[in-house]
Structures are given as structure tokens and as C-alpha cells.
């Protein structure tokens, strides 16, 4: 029908059940409810909080496919936003796929009644709800488990 629905954490070619939460002029935004027919590229994410915690977007995709996807995103953004049609050099792979992030940004709720508020990462798609993340596989060890 030509109508675009953006559903995070889905892959091209998948059939999914999604819940639309916003309709704009040219597209809708939806939450993923269930993957009905998965892509052959779909992997089991390393982090059990993938899809809940808003920190990662691509753990369900092999690293090689992540690099190709990121390269394609740069090409499409240059074409769409700047009107530049060009081949982009492939994304350079990192020697570390896990434990590489040296900066993480935990959020916290304001203390109430003398009690320390929750500390965690923002729930995917939210600005005020937190997810407790006892261990983050992409963060360096020095950044995990701090409360």
C-alpha cells in the first residue's frame, strides 16, 4: 500500500506482529509485539535485556551484517538528507565486539523519603522509565555493577 511502519528490532523480510502507537503524515511508528517469521539473519542477542534497554539496537544481527547495515544507513542518509549519491567506504570492524564501550550513561530517579531512587538505563522508546541493568555486555568491566 506504500505506507511505511517503523518497527524497531525487526529485520528486512521478517513478518511481525506490531502495535502502532503513532501515526504521522507519511508513516507510523510501532512497537514489536512478536516475530512471526524471523529473518535468516536474526541471532539470539547476547544481552537478556535487548529490546527493553534502549542502549543497543543491533544485537539481533550478526556483526558482519551490522557493519553492512551501518554502511548502508550512511549512504541512505547522505542521499536523503544531503542529496549526495556516493559509494561509502565499508564500516571498519572493531577488534572488540563486547566490553568496548568506555562511557555509559545510567539515569536515576530522584530520591524520595530519604531512599535512593532507581538507577539504570532508559527503557527503549521511553524518556522516564528505567531498566535495571546489572551487567552490560558492551560496557567495559569497570562500568558495570556500579550502584
Spans of features found by a protein language model:
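Accessory RNA-recognition modules of RNA-modification enzymes
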Residues: 1-147
Amino acid at each position: 500500500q506504500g505506507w511505511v511502519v517503523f518497527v524497531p528490532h525487526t529485520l528486512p523480510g521478517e513478518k511481525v506482529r506490531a502495535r502502532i502507537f503513532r501515526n504521522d503524515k507519511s508513516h507510523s511508528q510501532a512497537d514489536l509485539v512478536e516475530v512471526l517469521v524471523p529473518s535468516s539473519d536474526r541471532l539470539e542477542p547476547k544481552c537478556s535485556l535487548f529490546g527493553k534497554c534502549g542502549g543497543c539496537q543491533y544485537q539481533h544481527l550478526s556483526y558482519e551484517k551490522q557493519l553492512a547495515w551501518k554502511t548502508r544507513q550512511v549512504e541512505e542518509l547522505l542521499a536523503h538528507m544531503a542529496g549526495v549519491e556516493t559509494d561509502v567506504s565499508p564500516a571498519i570492524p572493531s577488534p572488540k565486539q563486547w566490553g568496548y564501550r568506555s562511557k555509559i550513561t545510567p539515569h536515576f530517579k530522584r530520591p524520595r523519603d530519604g531512599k535512593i531512587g532507581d538507577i539504570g538505563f532508559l527503557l527503549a522508546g521511553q524518556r522516564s522509565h528505567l531498566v535495571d541493568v546489572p551487567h552490560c555486555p558492551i560496557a567495559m568491566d569497570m562500568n558495570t555493577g556500579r550502584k
